[in-house]
UniProtKB/Swiss-Prot annotation:
NCBIfam families: PRK14548.1 (NF011118). Belongs to the universal ribosomal protein uL23 family. Keywords: Ribonucleoprotein, Ribosomal protein, RNA-binding, rRNA-binding. Residues 18-29 have a biased composition (Basic residues). It comes from the Eukaryota. This is Large ribosomal subunit protein uL23A. InterPro entries: Nucleotide-bd_a/b_plait_sf, Ribosomal_uL23-like, Ribosomal_uL23/eL15/eS24_sf, Ribosomal_uL23_CS, Ribosomal_uL23_N. Residues 1-10 have a biased composition (Low complexity). Pfam families: Ribosomal_L23 (PF00276), Ribosomal_L23eN (PF03939). It comes from Caenorhabditis elegans.
Amino acid sequence: MAPSAPAKTAKALDAKKKVVKGKRTTHRRQVRTSVHFRRPVTLKTARQARFPRKSAPKTSKMDHFRIIQHPLTTESAMKKIEEHNTLVFIVSNDANKYQIKDAVHKLYNVQALKVNTLITPLQQKKAYVRLTADYDALDVANKIGVI
């Protein structure tokens, strides 16, 4: 079945317009000044894994309860509590000062001003946690059960 008369005329008019307008773009030949062709950098999308390599993500073994092992209750520790507003803890050897400060905040709801650490001759890490002026180390020690 042949196309209808109005469709034919529409197609002819469209062709006429294209002829009158002429070719829009002219292909310009690129001048190459080098004998070496450097391949252009193209988009490289990130690879997507088809399945996870581990069935469950690894949980952190350094939780707050592992970082702070126990408070120290020696006479020198009591003196620090009374005179310097400082709590003394035995902590994990793997913990750093930031982790200790965060663990004290999470476990005892107190803000630490600074943390000093040392390794004892018994290869234990001891942390001196100085509290801010807002908190009293004696009250916190009572709450913990040190005194």
